[in-house]
């Protein structure tokens, strides 16, 4: 039973959520027209849906097509837009042409969002849309979010945060409106699988996407494959035994270790000898020199657990 179905315990919750929903609708109406930075995640799907419901014909979602977005996520995001009949545009972004992004500093997300917003601003002007909005919510307040700094620079609005909607409330409202992202796990971009300080490359992200795709095809839900460079001689960027991944024009990369994280409840199944052996075999075919399992399971920011720490 969802939070919205519980009669007594949820009365206060329902009242608070309904008040915030009313505020969100008023806020969107006040925009007059809006472009929504869309990713296919819980927050942006809900925001794009509400914008379309509140401002029919005056709201457009725009999704950034980048190597850091898995192809499956792009397809799913476009399908949701089609199913709920809200307009969406696909925009190619070029953050990988920026050395500051590729070097993967702690504020990498700033450079990604800066690239996105620098393209959205002229597009919104071209389409005659008054406001650009994105899916930051009230639960994000206090987190280290470099992308929010870029949003401030470009005067991007965060209506979910502005009306105080939390992640749990957005999920509850998504369930009310029948959105398929209600229970969708958080899905950070593929670049988040590479520890800060190790370069982010399209070749690495291709390996990560293929590895995570394989695990999800086996039924694992909360999945991260952390990509760690190893010392040693360069190797081909993709396994020569996997033509779909192999890019002969790409420069050689350092050998890499895959550190698999799955949800705590999924660990026992992955540890089954047959599963473990098959997964290791497939990830080596993708190009990983070593395949390991993190016994602590999935956790946010896990890519940096093995990153070099500053002295002192």
Residue ranges: model-predicted function:
Residues 2-176, 233-240, 244-245, 250, ...:
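ATP-dependent adenylation/nucleotidyltransferase module used to activate substrates
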Residues 73-74, 186, 271-275:
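Residues at alpha-helix caps and immediate loop-helix transition turns in enzyme cores, especially N-
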Residues 164, 202, 269-273:
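Ordered, soluble secondary-structure elements with a strong preference for glycine-centered loop motifs
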Residues 165, 171-215, 219-231, 235-238, ...:
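Mid-to-C-terminal catalytic subdomains of enzymes
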Residues 206-208, 274-277:
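Charged helix-capping and loop-helix junction motifs
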Residues 255-272:
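A short interface-forming secondary-structure element
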Residues 294-301:
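A short, acidic, flexible beta-alpha connecting loop/helix-capping segment that sits on the rim
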Residues 301-312:
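Short, low-order "capping/linker" segments at domain edges
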């Amino acid at each position: 039973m969802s939070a919205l179905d519980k009669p007594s315990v949820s009365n206060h919750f329902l009242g608070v959520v309904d008040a915030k929903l009313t505020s969100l609708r008023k806020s969107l109406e006040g925009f007059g027209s809006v472009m929504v930075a869309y990713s296919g995640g819980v927050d942006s799907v809900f925001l794009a849906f509400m914008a379309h419901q509140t401002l029919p014909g005056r709201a457009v979602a725009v999704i950034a097509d980048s190597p850091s977005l898995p192809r499956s996520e792009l397809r799913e995001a476009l399908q949701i837009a089609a199913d709920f009949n809200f307009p969406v545009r696909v925009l190619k972004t070029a953050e990988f042409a920026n050395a500051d992004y590729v070097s993967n500093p702690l504020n990498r997300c700033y450079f990604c969002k800066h690239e996105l917003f620098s393209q959205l601003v002229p597009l919104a002007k071209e389409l005659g849309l008054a406001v650009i909005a994105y899916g930051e919510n009230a639960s994000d307040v206090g987190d280290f979010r470099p992308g929010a700094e870029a949003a401030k620079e470009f005067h991007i609005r965060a209506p979910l945060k502005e009306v105080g909607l939390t992640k749990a409330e957005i999920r509850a409202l998504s369930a009310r409106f029948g959105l398929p992202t209600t229970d969708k796990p958080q899905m950070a971009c593929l670049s988040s699988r590479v520890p800060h300080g190790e370069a982010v490359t399209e070749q690495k992200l291709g390996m990560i996407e293929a590895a995570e795709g394989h695990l999800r095809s086996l039924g694992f839900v909360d999945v991260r494959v952390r990509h760690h460079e190893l010392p040693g001689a360069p190797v081909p960027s993709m396994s020569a035994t996997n033509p779909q991944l192999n890019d002969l024009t790409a420069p050689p990369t350092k050998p890499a270790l895959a550190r698999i994280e799955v949800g705590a409840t999924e660990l026992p199944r992955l540890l089954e000898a047959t599963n473990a052996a098959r997964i290791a075999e497939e990830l080596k075919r993708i190009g990983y020199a070593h395949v390991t399992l993190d016994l602590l399971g999935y956790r946010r920011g896990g890519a940096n657990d093995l990153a070099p720490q500053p002295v002192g």
